[in-house]
């Protein structure tokens, strides 16, 4: 029964366009629900981002069918840096930075329901001689150099520190295999070489007869093959809502094209495949309604931040772009979420100076034209002239919402 569950899940992952490769189809039949699966997350930043999130979703799918799931927090491996398909060596992080990053990322992983283990615990009592004898002895340098993940870096320069990364990832797999009965490692398509190294290490040090397998998943990319996870301004889309507000994430997904929206519904949501096809068919009847994008945005924000934040993001979006004169429905908390999505500009001595200084308008003539055409609004009300009485009281005497034309927005603050 459990074998069928794994096979069925792999077939679903293929239909969801996330499955990339597996090291052994035959061993799938040997895996049971008593076996665990893990994914590693190196705390190289203060938060995980949307590109990491797809691996969290993939791991959650295994958990949902009954497998034990573990997220490895790379307290040790983040001190080195994975060279896989990187153009240059990462700058080494300080211990203080790694500790701070670990604290935040652990909470994100635990909130998603995973057991979190810090791999620093595997190495903190191991000295260099222990490592060379119990780990290094089992790795062939020529084989390590032939891995695609590092081969491209050999000519441009690869430090021994980075070169040894795959040995630590392999040792992680062995420890989890022994102590947690983990037989499966999940990783992005760029992790194939590291996964194979782990399997080879287990074969040499434990047994060749264990049902250990590595499964790689496609990276999060758009229909043009570009990595997804950056906002239009180039900043990462973080899982931490203090770095990327739920509304900004919502808007990013809402603005995807139809092909990307469909693929992301498959890859990032837990909706049934039949439901996704139903949404797609409804969408195609009237693409201007952007039903796929709307459902995608809501589902992802809900799964990351909770239903309340998803409803808030929907409310803000509806107030800004759909419902006429609904600015007054936005709360102060809603307004703060707009940071990162619309420009916040400082208030000068008066409204006209503020607009000129922020390059929103260029002259009094242009200002008067917008006023005449009723194309300048503050908090949903028409600006009537240079002496317009600004309604600061609407937002705690701190913010004004400016709209120019049909779709240009700013928040003025003081």
Swiss-Prot record:
It comes from the Bacteria. GO terms for cellular component: cytosol. InterPro entries: aa-tRNA-synth_Ic, Rossmann-like_a/b/a_fold, S4_RNA-bd_sf, SYY-like_C, Tyr-tRNA-ligase, Tyr-tRNA-ligase_bac-type, Tyr-tRNA-ligase_bac_1. Its main location: cytoplasm. It catalyses: tRNA(Tyr) + L-tyrosine + ATP = L-tyrosyl-tRNA(Tyr) + AMP + diphosphate + H(+). Belongs to the class-I aminoacyl-tRNA synthetase family. TyrS type 1 subfamily. This is Tyrosine--tRNA ligase. It comes from Mycoplasmopsis pulmonis (strain UAB CTIP).
């Amino acid at each position: 029964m459990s074998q069928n569950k794994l096979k069925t899940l792999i077939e679903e992952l293929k239909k969801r366009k996330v499955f990339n490769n597996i090291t052994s189809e035959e061993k799938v039949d040997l895996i049971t629900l008593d076996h665990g699966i893990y994914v590693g997350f190196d705390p190289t930043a203060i938060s995980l981002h949307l590109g990491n999130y797809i691996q969290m979703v993939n791991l959650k799918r295994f958990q949902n069918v009954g497998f034990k799931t573990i997220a490895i927090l790379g307290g040790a491996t983040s001190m080195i840096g994975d060279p896989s398909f990187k153009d240059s060596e990462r700058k080494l992080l300080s211990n203080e930075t790694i500790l701070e990053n670990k604290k935040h990322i652990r909470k994100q992983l635990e909130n998603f329901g995973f057991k979190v283990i810090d791999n620093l615990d595997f190495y903190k009592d191991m000295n260099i001689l222990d490592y060379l004898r119990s780990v290094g002895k089992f790795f062939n340098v020529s084989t390590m150099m032939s891995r695609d993940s590092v081969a491209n870096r050999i000519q441009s320069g690869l430090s021994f520190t980075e070169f040894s990364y795959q040995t630590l990832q392999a040792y992680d797999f062995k420890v989890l295999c022994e102590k947690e009965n983990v037989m499966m490692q999940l990783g992005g398509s760029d992790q194939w070489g590291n996964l194979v190294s782990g399997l080879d290490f287990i074969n040499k040090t434990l047994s060749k007869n264990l049902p250990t397998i590595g499964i790689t998943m496609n990276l999060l990319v758009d229909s043009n093959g570009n990595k997804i996870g950056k906002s239009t301004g180039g900043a990462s889309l973080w899982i931490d809502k203090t770095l990327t507000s739920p509304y900004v994430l919502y808007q990013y997904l809402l603005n995807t094209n139809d092909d990307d929206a469909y693929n992301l519904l498959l890859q990032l949501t837990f909706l049934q495949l039949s439901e996704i096809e139903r949404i797609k068919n409804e969408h195609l009847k009237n693409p201007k309604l952007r039903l796929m994008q709307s459902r995608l945005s809501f589902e992802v924000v809900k799964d990351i931040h909770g239903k309340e934040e998803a409803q808030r993001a929907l409310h803000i979006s509806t107030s800004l772009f759909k419902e006429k004169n609904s600015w007054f429905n936005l709360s102060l908390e809603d307004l703060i979420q707009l940071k990162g999505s619309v420009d916040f500009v400082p208030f000068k001595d008066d409204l006209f100076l503020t607009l000129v200084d922020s390059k929103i308008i260029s002259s009094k003539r242009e200002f008067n034209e917008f006023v005449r055409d009723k194309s300048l609004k503050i908090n949903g009300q028409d600006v009537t002239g240079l002496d317009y009485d600004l309604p600061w009281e609407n937002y705690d005497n701190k913010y004004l919402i400016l709209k120019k034309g049909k779709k240009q927005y700013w928040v003025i603050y003081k």
